[in-house]
UniProtKB/Swiss-Prot annotation:
The keyword Zinc does not apply. Disulfide bonds: none annotated. Residues 20-32 have a biased composition (Basic and acidic residues). GO terms for biological process: positive regulation of SREBP signaling pathway; regulation of translation. Residues 1-37 are annotated as: Disordered. Pfam families: Nro1. This is Enhancer of translation termination 1. It is found in: Nucleus. Keywords: Nucleus, Transcription, Transcription regulation, Translation regulation. It comes from Scheffersomyces stipitis (strain ATCC 58785 / CBS 6054 / NBRC 10063 / NRRL Y-11545). Its main location: nucleus. InterPro entries: Nro1/ETT1.
């Protein structure tokens, strides 16, 4: 597809205001001093050259689909948003004089503006004051947009993403292991609850209005941000401990937090991990509702990428993440079963972590079987790695049955077929995995 260049930011300089500027106006001034406002970005032809809002939307998509590592582009987007906002206000004043004002910036304008402001914080993590300013401005812009578009699902999704990023970049980044909750340091579980309530509000409205097309890759990113945030909380303090202790054991040991720590309530509760699981499964259901003709039987493979339902790549990505989450949950009961069944050092033990041999086996088998289902749905005929994910899950499931039992051999044999196929098309990339299975 042919592309063209777009120059933006030529008219972004604003007149000085007598009243105190809002956060986003102060940011506009700061960014104007950091370099030329002239930016050239290639856009797809679908952007109407005469529609500035459409151009902004296309520019944001260009950035959003990139590596997101270009601060200059983000500055340009913010300058353009500011210019469009000022022009809109000027037009509003003129039209109001004629009592004919009907112009209103669309909800996605406010969404782009807010997300761009939050994105800018990622480039200034060394200056927490700036980070706070960017996030305050981002939340303010989202709220202003919602005041004009009260039923905007997109703005609610965007706000929830901003709030999640804010927790990590503005707050967690400043914490230490011995930090305690105070007037200046909030209990972060309440902030996380607020972000998740905002997401749930968007999710509920989308379902009520049957706007299932909104459950796309952009919104899936919100759940990824949450997953990353929970991982940060789980591993909080390990990097500090590793710097102070030369022992490798630190990597596997969780750093204890006092009840007064801002992250304590998040780490000690499993409700947030369960929330993620529940809502990504619901996300998958909504994707399926949008793509009514989508194939969900892993055995029904399209003959080529061109014949695929357009939502299948998204669906595969969701299923992969769900499958991986079940595998992760299965790690503890699987380890308990293996230890009680095969470790002579525990032959007199009846339980580990409150689980007996039979209980741990049953729980792990159920979790890995569920994981296997989703990983099979995540298989891509063009990506051998997705086949190997299935094979490895089959091996893990086989390990939970009696040695040389019919069930174990069945899972191993199926895994071997898959690994041989993957190994052949990748010129031996998975030879080690295959040899490990065969015991060579």
């Amino acid at each position: 597809m042919a592309k063209r260049s777009l120059g933006i930011g030529k008219a972004s300089k604003a007149k000085k205001q007598k009243s105190a500027p809002r956060e986003e106006e102060k940011i506009e001034k700061d960014q104007a001093t950091e370099g030329s406002n002239e930016i050239t970005v290639e856009l797809n032809e679908e952007a109407d050259a005469n529609d500035e809002i459409a151009q902004l939307k296309a520019l944001w998509k260009t950035y959003n689909d990139s590596e997101k590592d270009n601060e200059l582009v983000i500055n340009g987007i913010i300058h353009e948003c500011d210019r469009l906002l000022r022009n809109s206000k000027l037009g509003e004043e003129k039209e109001k004089e004629k009592e004919q004002y009907t112009q209103e910036l669309p909800d996605f304008f406010h969404s782009i503006y807010a997300l761009a402001l939050a994105e800018l914080a990622k480039f200034h993590t060394e200056d927490n004051k700036k980070v706070a300013e960017y996030f305050d401005a981002a939340v303010e812009r989202a709220d202003l947009g919602l005041s004009q578009h009260q039923d905007s699902i997109q703005l609610l999704f965007s706000k929830s993403k901003i709030l999640l990023h804010q927790i990590a970049l503005q707050y967690i980044s400043q914490l230490k292991v011995d930090t305690s909750i105070s007037k200046k340091v909030p209990k972060l579980s309440s902030y996380l609850d607020s972000a998740l309530r905002t997401y749930e509000e968007a999710e509920k409205k989308a379902d009520e209005l049957k706007k299932y097309e909104l459950f796309n890759a952009d919104q899936l990113e919100i759940l990824q941000v949450l997953d990353d945030l929970l991982d940060i909380v789980d591993n909080f303090g390990k990097d500090i401990a590793e710097g102070e202790d030369d022992d490798d054991e630190v990597e596997d040991d969780e750093i204890e937090l006092e009840e007064s720590h801002p992250l304590y309530a998040i780490r000690e509760s499993d409700e947030y991990n369960q929330w993620w699981r529940d809502h990504i499964i619901l996300f998958l259901d909504n994707v399926d509702k949008h793509g009514k003709e989508i194939k969900v039987d892993f055995k029904e493979k399209a003959k080529s990428q061109e014949e695929e339902h357009p939502l299948l790549p998204l669906r595969r990505e969701i299923c992969k993440r769900i499958g991986q989450s079940y595998l992760q949950e299965a790690e503890v009961p699987s380890s308990v079963f293996t230890t009680l069944a095969y470790d002579d050092g525990f032959k007199n033990e009846k339980e580990i972590n409150g689980l007996s041999l039979k209980e741990s086996q049953k729980i792990a088998q159920k979790l890995i079987s569920t994981a296997l289902k989703y990983l099979q749905w995540a298989e891509d005929q063009e990506e051998p790695e997705t086949w190997v994910n299935v094979a490895e899950a089959m091996i893990s499931l086989g390990n939970l049955y009696e040695v040389e039992s019919e069930e174990q051999e069945s899972h191993y044999q199926e895994a071997e077929k898959i690994l041989n196929k993957a190994n052949n098309v990748t010129n031996g990339k998975y030879e080690d995995v295959l040899e490990n299975l065969l015991g060579d």
